[in-house]
């Protein structure tokens, strides 16, 4: 009888332990920016319990500085971070131990923006002007590629770090142009305050297409099975947004105070067609082509095999 009781106890403890372990996996993700419609799949997955359904507890952390999240991933202080493909190439070239494990937006959002009624009518007009930026290295890479098409160098412009203050700095004429303005956000922001902007798109001015927003992890965690659960929830959330933009906008806008405004409403609508429907898939050639571009422009020192830093 005692043997049966002991066996029963062991089985019961095993079941209880298994349930406890299966309850939740905690995941911390550093955002690239303050919460905005670019993060809609994460917000919807959170609000509709898609993360919870796959056994995840996800904490989203907004950065004090948009340059910080990749460094925190490299240091093992974040599980994931939202970053940018161009920035990833540069960081890997510098030896940062990070790898792309998924994609949020697979097409460019970034743009070079000036005031529509201002003196800058062409990229060639930027010579001797001030250009604001927020993310070092990455945005300089895009700007460099755009300038070179018009026989200009980075030394022909004055770069000013304006952190999150892109549109305000441009409107206040603290700078003549900003690189890093998202075409789905800053252009709407400027239009709302009746100071419309003119955008120059990198992919139309000498820069190869690239994935704007990606998920990165530490190379040591590139095959973490928890990420598969995360992307399963993200994919479900993305499809839900595409299929039901009206109710998902309501969920997004009520996630916290300050999101339910005209700017976010416009940006939400403009961002919908840009979310990738298969977050773990990616085009190898997109990474190869962009790597060659950066090497040609002297922004990275060497070509690194894509498979080492971009998990297919």
What does each model-found stretch correspond to?
Residues 18-22:
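Sec/Tat signal peptide C-region and signal peptidase I cleavage site
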Residues 223-299:
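Secondary-structure end/capping motifs
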Residues 7-16:
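Bacterial N-terminal signal peptides
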Residues 23-163, 167-172, 176-184, 199-200, ...:
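Short, glycine-/small- and polar/acidic-enriched structural segments
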Residues 54, 100, 249-251, 302-304:
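Short, hydrophobic secondary-structure boundary micro-motifs
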Residues 38, 104-114, 195-219, 231, ...:
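Periplasmic-binding protein-like
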Residues 86, 164-255:
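Pocket-lining segment of extracytoplasmic ligand-binding domains
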Residues 1-7:
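Positively charged n-region of N-terminal signal peptides that target proteins for export
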């Amino acid at each position: 009888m005692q043997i049966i009781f002991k066996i029963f106890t062991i089985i019961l403890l095993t079941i209880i332990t298994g349930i406890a372990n299966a309850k939740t996996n905690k995941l911390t993700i550093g955002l690239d920016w303050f919460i905005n419609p670019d993060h809609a799949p994460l917000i919807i997955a959170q609000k509709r319990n898609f993360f919870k359904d796959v056994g995840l507890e996800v904490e989203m952390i907004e950065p004090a500085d948009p340059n910080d999240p990749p460094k925190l991933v490299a240091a093992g202080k974040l599980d994931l971070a939202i970053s940018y493909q161009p920035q990833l190439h540069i960081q890997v070239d510098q030896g940062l131990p990070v790898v792309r494990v998924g994609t949020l937006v697979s097409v460019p959002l970034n743009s070079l923006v000036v005031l529509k009624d201002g003196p800058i009518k062409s990229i060639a007009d930027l010579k001797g002007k001030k250009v604001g930026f927020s993310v070092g290295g990455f945005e300089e890479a895009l700007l460099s590629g755009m300038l070179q098409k018009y026989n200009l160098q980075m030394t022909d412009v004055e770069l000013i770090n304006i952190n999150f203050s892109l549109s305000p700095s441009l409107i206040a004429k603290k700078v003549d142009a900003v690189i890093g303005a998202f075409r789905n956000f800053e252009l709407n922001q400027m239009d709302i305050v009746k100071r419309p902007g003119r955008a120059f798109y990198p992919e139309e001015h000498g820069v190869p297409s690239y994935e704007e927003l990606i998920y990165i992890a530490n190379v040591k965690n590139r095959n973490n099975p928890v990420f598969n659960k995360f992307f399963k929830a993200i994919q479900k959330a993305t499809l839900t947004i595409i299929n039901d933009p009206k109710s998902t906008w309501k969920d997004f806008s009520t996630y916290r105070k300050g999101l339910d405004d005209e700017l976010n409403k416009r940006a939400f609508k403009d961002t919908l067609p840009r979310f990738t429907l298969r977050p773990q898939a990616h085009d190898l050639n997109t990474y190869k082509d962009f790597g060659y571009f950066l090497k040609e422009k002297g922004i990275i020192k060497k070509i690194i095999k894509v498979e080492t830093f971009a998990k297919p």
